[in-house]
Amino acid sequence: MARDVTSLGSMVVLCFLLAAVVGYLLLVRKRGAALLVVGSILGGTVISFGLKLLFNRPRPEIPGGIQVFTASFPSSHAMLSAVTYLTLGVLMTRVAAGARLKAYFIGLAVFLTVVIGLSRVYVGVHYATDVLAGWCVGSAWAALCWVVALRLQRRGQVEQPGTSDVPDGTSIE
């Protein structure tokens, strides 16, 4: 089960999720939001692999464990899960009606981020500090991207959530 959970933070799963969300945003003519989501996740990916190259920390040596060929610090699964799921969670809160639904989306994003990170330690491919660093850097990057998105929305450079220019009247509300 831990390997199933850890796969939720894999590049394959995150790329499919990114493609699905961006496809949806483009269909409802939220090009600015789509660009911000892509920029957030691609930026997080570049930062993650840049930090791996900088620190080049070896992984834990577990006989018979999962073979991984990149450096250990920081955990890309933990970092990119934080960036992706927290960004999408906040995106959903911008269109969700009611505090309960907003709390659900943020709670789900945090839960996924935490269990994916913990699974990396459990399966023996990271030290706890790798995961903690991934969570911290990923959360900080996601927060910075949210601030940029809010400023761009206030300036009118990115469309406000909840409005749609789709001809058939489809809205994301």
Task: Describe the predicted segments one by one.
Residues M1-A71, T87-R94, G107:
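Hydrophobic alpha-helical bundle signature of multipass membrane enzymes
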Residues P60-E173:
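Membrane-embedded catalytic cores of phosphoryl/pyrophosphoryl-handling enzymes
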